[in-house]
Amino acid sequence: MNRLFCDTLYFTALVNPKDQWHQSAIEIEPLVESVDLVTTEEVLIELLNFYSEFGKRMRFEVSTFVRKLLLNPKFEIVGRSEISFLDALELYDSRLDKGYSLTDCISMNVCRELNINEILTHDHHFEQEGFKILL
């Protein structure tokens, strides 16, 4: 295992000590420290959007958290493109019976492209697509 993909739900749990998955996110830290990590701009946007109504203090903490990720050489942050959007829209359209968000679809496509099978999340949508979730 060389790389793990970080989903929004992992970051949400990591940032907020009151999150029900916070302890799981902390406990997996030794594994996280031993590998390179990948996420997408869409995941970071989703994280910032989620905390946008949590008040000034939390908005500042999340913004600081994201800025640290951007500077961390262990993190690869895959940028947005028209092709990634359209490819994700294809997956979204092909899974109309699922509750996948477009961000999930982008993440799944990135994981497939980069041969990443393990996801830091508790989102079972990833399991439905054959990925192993680690929270």
What are these regions (language model features)?
Residues 11, 44, 126-127:
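A generic structural signal for short hydrophobic patches within well-formed alpha-helices
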Residues 75-117:
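Active-site neighborhoods of divalent-metal-dependent phosphate/nucleic-acid chemistry enzymes
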Residues 1-39, 54-64:
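Short, well-structured N-terminal submotif of metal-dependent ribonuclease cores
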Residues 50-74, 78:
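Helix-adjacent hinge/juxtasegments
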Residues 1, 108-109, 113-135:
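Acidic, PIN/NYN-like endoribonuclease modules and their adjacent C-terminal/linker elements
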